[in-house]
């Protein structure tokens, strides 16, 4: 015959987590929020996937970006920061309704994390696109940066835009540009000016200098051949991450109507490639024509 055992217990009501939180708040008690990730730089990369960019050109851009992040000098620039880490997110843009975030925030602090980032970028499928809304690229980039402030805190915030033509869809370029710059975000540009490509705008670097780039230390790196995209991205990243304004001044080689024309002094890439030229952002002949492509009904870019 089994004996029954009576166990004396005390009664403790079980409260749900939300109810516990409400009661703690009622009595002035709070639970500590998770600590935000501290980084030197929040960098958003915006890639044009409008109909003027064919699949091979986009592949060269994706591959070039991945290769640039794997470059030892880029990794070194990241590690030489005060915190030794940056955060990177990416998205594809064309017309505003077609824009798509392709990679959420990745923290880069060494070669292994750079390799993981590069693999993700290489494997990113193409987003279908139509026109070119650079204004919406700035707006989405700013949204990505600001919406992550509780989780990732950076001393500098940068949007980097790469495309092959002026704004021709979405909101006015000047309005989007000024709003983003007022938020303390720097915008740099990587315009593609390949005269063998479908979309070719010969003065796109000047357009970018006047209408797209902005904020302290902002600059434009022009790409004249898709095969040189990796070298241009590499130079841009080194300058962007280190933000060495002394290096920029010492590297000055000439001046154009758009402002100082600079060459970066960094280690040469393995394959011979023209040294990318860097144009500092500033007013020029395009300053009054930032929306030359129209608002959804101009150009073919």
Description of each model-found segment:
Residues 192-248:
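Von Willebrand factor A/integrin I-like adhesion domains
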Residues 37-104, 113-156, 159-162, 189-204, 232:
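Von Willebrand factor
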Residues 46-56, 88, 104, 120-131, ...:
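Second-shell loop/turn segments in exported
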Residues 78, 165-210:
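VWA/integrin I-like adhesion module and closely mimicked acidic/polar interface patches used
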